[in-house]
Amino acid sequence: MQAARFVVSGVVQGVWYRASTRQRAVALGLVGHARNQADGSVEVVAAGSAAALDALEAWLWQGPPAATVAAVTRTACAVPPTEDFVTG
């Protein structure tokens, strides 16, 4: 299992970005979380197969219809201690 931390910036808060990310992550078989950050970005930490992480990254660039994504940064991270994908 691999893990990645994504930081998504743009118009990504108040547009169902976290909930939509959770739906996509669960469909891809990923675990982790999506959280709003004080600077207006959304942090996504996800763990699963490399292919699923790549698919999530591609989706993060699009997001839900009301979102306008300006940037997605990806870094490796430790596998999160969870068996689900949560928002917070």
From Swiss-Prot:
Disulphide linkage map: none
Substrates-to-products reaction catalysed: an acyl phosphate + H2O = a carboxylate + phosphate + H(+)
Keywords: Hydrolase
Entry keyword Hydrolase: yes
EC id: 3.6.1.7
InterPro entries from the UniProt entry: Acylphosphatase (IPR020456), Acylphosphatase-like_dom (IPR001792), Acylphosphatase-like_dom_sf (IPR036046)
Gene Ontology molecular functions: acylphosphatase activity
Record flagged with keyword Hydrolase: yes
Domain Acylphosphatase-like residue range list: 3-88
PANTHER family hit by this protein: ACYLPHOSPHATASE (PTHR47268:SF4)
NCBIfam families noted in UniProt: PRK14446.1
Protein name: Acylphosphatase
